[in-house]
A protein has these predicted regions:
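Structural recognition of alpha->loop->beta junctions
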Residues: 191-205, 269-287, 372-378
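A short, surface-exposed interaction/processing loop segment used at functional sites
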Residues: 76-102
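N-terminal low-complexity, Pro/Thr/Ser-rich intrinsically disordered segments
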Residues: 1-22, 97-119
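Noncatalytic carbohydrate-binding groove/subsite architecture in carbohydrate-active enzymes
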Residues: 155, 159, 163-166, 170-176, ...
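Boundary/entry segment of secreted carbohydrate-active catalytic domains
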Residues: 103-150
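Structural recognition of the beta-strand scaffold that forms the well-ordered cores
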Residues: 119-124, 141-147, 167-173, 201-206, ...
Length: 420
C-alpha cells in the first residue's frame, strides 16, 4: 500500500525521516512500501536502544523517540528504524525479522540478462519473407511468439529466428485450468528451462494473469503467480543465465473499481503491487507491461476524450507498472495502436479507436520507441502486432497489425527512421 498521511503530522514527518534514511541505506525507492508500523515511546538511552554510530557517546536515561518497522516492496525484511522526538537523529536497529511467508520462496538463481540497451521487436503470426523484410525495415531485433507449455513447435521458432538474425521472445501461457493441476508449476518450469537451453533469448512467464481467461475465476492471486515465476526463473537461469526472464504482463484495466478486485479480474496496478509485495522482483529481469488502448500521441499525458485513467497514456502506464519495482526496467511485451483503416467499422467494444488512422499508428509507434529508449526505463518494446490478418466482431487484432491490408507498412518506415 502507499504510505500516506493518515497519522498526526509530527509522526508523519518522523516517518519520512526514517523512510528517507532506509531508502538511502538499501538504495531503493520507498514511495510505496509493503507495510509500516510506528510507536512513540521512551527508550533507555540517547541512541533509542540501537547501536550508536562509531564515536558517538551514548547517554543513559529515558529518551523520547519514534520506532518504525518498515517492510519495503519486494523485500521480506522488516527494518527497525528509530527517530528522536525532535526529528534530528536517526538510529538503525537493523532487521526486526522477516515478513510471514517470506521464506516460502526459493533463493533466486544467478543470471546476467538484466539491464542492457533498448531494443525493438514485433509479435508475428508467421516468420516469412514478408514479415522478415518488414521487421528489418523497422530495425526490429526481436521476434515474439506466444506458445502453450509443452509445444514442440517452439524449438522450430527458435531455430527460424536465429537463422534470420533475430533474437526470440517466447511468451509461454497455459490454460486457466492448468493452474489447478498438481505438479503443473514444476512441469512448466521444466519446459521453459528446455527453451532456455535451446537458445530462447527471452521468456515471458504467463500472460494477463489478472483476468479469468488466463487464471482460474475466483482464484486470481499474485502471490500464487510469484510461486510459478520463482520456479520458472530458477529453472531458466540454471540452463541459460543469459535468457531474459520477463514477468507476465497484466491486462491494463480499471474495471474492478476502487477496490481493484473481483472474482473475474483485478486492476493491473493492484495486481502488480501485490506481485511486488510477494517478492516478484527477485525472480525477473524485466517487468512485463502491455499498452494497447492509446488513441492519442504517447507524448501526451492528458487530453484523452474518454477520461484520464492512467492506462490511457503511455507515460502513466509505464509509471503504474514500475511503481512497485524500483531499479527494474520494463519490457513492453505488447504495445500497439488500433486502427480500423482498410477494414471498416470496429466492433462495439473497440469503437474507442474508430478514428485512429494508419498514419497516426505509424507516428505513435515511432514516438513510443523514442520515449522508451530515452527513458532508460524500458529494455524492450514488442510491437503488437506485425502481421495478424484477423478482424472479427469480437477481436479486431488485424487493426493492430503494422502490415496493413494490401501489404503496406507505414510503421516500418517510421520505426526504421528512429531506431539505430
Amino acid at each position: 500500500p502507499a504510505a500516506d498521511a493518515t497519522v498526526a503530522p509530527r509522526e508523519w514527518q518522523a516517518f519520512n525521516v526514517a523512510r528517507g534514511y532506509l531508502s538511502r541505506k538499501i538504495n531503493a525507492n520507498l514511495r510505496y512500501v509493503t507495510s509500516w508500523e510506528w510507536e512513540l515511546a521512551l527508550f533507555p538511552d540517547s541512541a533509542l536502544g540501537c547501536p550508536p554510530p562509531e564515536g558517538e557517546t551514548v547517554i543513559k536515561g529515558n529518551t523520547a523517540g519514534y520506532q518504525f518497522i518498515i517492510q519495503p516492496l519486494g523485500n521480506p525484511n522488516r527494518y527497525d528504524i528509530r527517530v528522536t522526538y525532535d526529528l534530528q537523529r536517526v538510529y538503525d536497529c537493523g532487521i526486526a525479522g522477516t515478513a510471514p511467508g517470506g521464506g516460502n520462496l526459493p533463493p533466486p538463481a544467478a543470471g546476467s540478462a538484466a539491464g542492457g540497451g533498448f531494443e525493438l521487436g514485433g509479435h508475428v503470426l508467421e516468420l516469412n519473407a514478408g514479415t522478415i523484410n518488414a521487421m528489418r525495415q523497422a530495425k526490429m531485433r526481436w521476434v515474439k511468439k506466444q506458445i502453450r507449455p509443452g509445444d514442440g513447435a517452439a524449438f522450430g521458432h527458435i531455430a527460424a529466428a536465429k537463422a534470420n538474425g533475430f533474437k526470440i521472445l517466447l511468451s509461454v501461457v497455459g490454460k486457466p485450468e492448468d493452474i489447478l493441476v498438481p505438479g503443473f508449476f514444476d512441469q512448466y518450469a521444466g519446459y521453459v528451462a528446455e527453451l532456455a537451453g535451446a537458445g530462447a533469448d527471452g521468456i515471458e512467464v504467463w500472460n494477463e494473469m489478472n483476468l479469468d481467461r488466463e487464471w482460474p475465476n475466483g482464484q486470481i492471486d499474485p502471490a500464487k503467480y510469484v510461486e510459478l515465476l520463482a520456479k520458472a526463473y530458477n529453472a531458466i537461469k540454471s540452463r541459460n543465465p543469459n535468457t531474459l526472464v520477463i514477468s507476465g504482463a497484466p491486462a491494463p484495466t480499471g474495471a474492478a473499481g476502487p477496490g481493484g478486485k473481483t472474482a473475474a479480474y483485478w486492476n493491473d496496478d493492484v495486481y502488480m503491487l501485490e506481485m511486488a509485495q510477494a517478492g516478484a522482483a527477485q525472480y525477473l529481469d524485466c517487468v512485463g507491461v502491455h499498452y494497447n488502448e492509446g488513441i492519442i500521441s504517447p507524448n501526451q499525458s492528458s487530453g484523452d476524450p474518454r477520461d484520464n485513467y492512467p492506462t490511457r497514456y503511455f507515460s502513466t502506464m509505464l509509471n503504474r507498472a514500475l511503481a512497485g519495482f524500483s531499479g527494474k526496467q520494463a519490457c513492453f511485451t505488447e504495445l500497439g495502436y488500433l486502427s480500423p483503416e482498410g477494414y471498416g467499422a470496429l466492433p462495439g467494444g473497440f469503437a474507442w479507436a474508430q478514428n485512429v488512422s494508419v498514419a497516426q499508428q505509424a507516428q505513435w509507434l515511432a514516438e513510443a520507441a523514442v520515449l522508451s529508449a530515452r527513458s532508460g526505463r524500458v529494455r524492450l518494446m514488442i510491437v503488437w502486432n506485425v502481421d495478424f490478418p484477423f478482424f472479427s466482431g469480437t477481436d479486431p487484432m488485424g487493426g493492430y497489425a503494422i502490415i496493413r491490408p494490401g501489404g503496406a507498412c507505414p510503421a516500418c518506415a517510421t520505426l526504421g527512421s528512429v531506431m539505430p
